[in-house]
Amino acid sequence: MSHNDTIVAQATPPGRGGVGILRISGLKARDVAQEVLGKLPKPRYADYLPFKDVDGSALDQGIALWFPGPNSFTGEDVLELQGHGGPVILDLLLKRILTLPGVRIARPGEFSERAFLNDKLDLAQAEAIADLIDASSEQAARSALNSLQGAFSARVNHLVEALTHLRIYVEAAIDFPDEEIDFLSDGKIEAQLNGVIADLDAVRTEARQGSLLREGMKVVIAGRPNAGKSSLLNALAGREAAIVTDIAGTTRDVLREHIHIDGMPLHIIDTAGLRDANDEVERIGIERAWQEIEQADRVLFMVDGTTTDAVDPADIWPDFIARLPKNLPITVVRNKADITGETLGISEVNGHSLVRLSARTGEGVDVLRNHLKQSMGFDTNMEGGFLARRRHLQALAEAANHLEQGKAQLLGAWAGELLAEELRLAQQSLSEITGEFTSDDLLGRIFSSFCIGK
């Protein structure tokens, strides 16, 4: 679809509401105002007017806001019509606007896409709009707003600028081959490079925090039937999310709960008890349990403390451990400490964390909460911050790798050309975050995940 088209979409959620907003952007927005309002409102002033149908009769009345480009969100002429929030009224008004030639329904995220293409915001800021809307906690919302206001982009642009200066220095050395070795070995370039690497490491640390705020951690509770998995889900969720009985196999499907631990989103998944099942429904539930385990960030291996004294997972259930994906973190949870009399707390056993608790009474559950927060490296004391997506983390990691490769070329062979190339690739990776170097395919995937009216 052409970016020369004028687009329209509802900017408020579907359904009934006190106010419903239609947003129009493009060259024909001026014509829409003349046809629907009978005049062009004063720029950036609220004008209370009737919204007219083709025959001149009123469809609704409300507030019209006119933002002539380039001083608008999209950088184009923008008209907003704020009427009553009934779906029938909004649908009639939308159909009226679509009768005008050159006007079409907007694609998801197309308003934000046009703002990006018209340099009203960069790609990281555009993504922050969607993240702010989807924020599931106060801390996530504040971090998304920081990104929208340019905090993340400013950090990235600072790194790009530092790399630009470093590249100039290195390439100047290459232009004078008789003095290149002296330029590269005098310590100045190494010091500057180390400074950029340190700054990048700091940004990566904050970005990982931002990714946790946005994505959360997926934790799967797994174990044999009647180990107390559903009781632990309820204890972590703080409500009776799962049915708990003494009957083995009560949980036959996957149960999901979304909670927060000091601002960090946590996706807790309770699964069917793992065993050789003859019942077809239970067997399907066990298959789904393994699917969730394979996609988990961490598995809570739930153990009934009344059935074994073992603490090493390989001793408790070797077949279960052997089937787990390689490098998947495991926390052994010895449950029913209120019955066994075990000392509550956390310890380490052969590289695995071991938590002793009682899911039924809630004793020791706070220890598990703190363990989950710490195991993901979440820092509740970090001020400010910004949200980050997986693609941001990947771009930062690629940039860090190129800088390390460049440092190896500098210190190992004084190879100026190879160092310059690694610096260029690092700069390109960072520029993908803000959209300075980004493929059209990636842009399409990013903006298609937005709301229609954004």
UniProtKB/Swiss-Prot annotation:
Identify the residues that bind K(+). N226, T245, I247, T250
The subcellular localization recorded is: Cytoplasm
| GO MF assignments | GTP binding; GTPase activity; metal ion binding
Please name the SUPFAM superfamilies in this protein's record: P-loop containing nucleoside triphosphate hydrolases, TrmE connector domain
Q: Does the keyword Transcription apply?
A: no
Comment on bound cofactor: Binds 1 potassium ion per subunit.
- One Pfam family hit: TrmE_N
Q: Which residues form the TrmE-type G domain?
A: 216-377
Top EC group? hydrolase
Role description:
Exhibits a very high intrinsic GTPase hydrolysis rate. Involved in the addition of a carboxymethylaminomethyl (cmnm) group at the wobble position (U34) of certain tRNAs, forming tRNA-cmnm(5)s(2)U34.
Give the PANTHER family listed for this entry: TRNA MODIFICATION GTPASE GTPBP3 (PTHR42714), TRNA MODIFICATION GTPASE GTPBP3, MITOCHONDRIAL (PTHR42714:SF2)
- Name of this chain's protein: tRNA modification GTPase MnmE
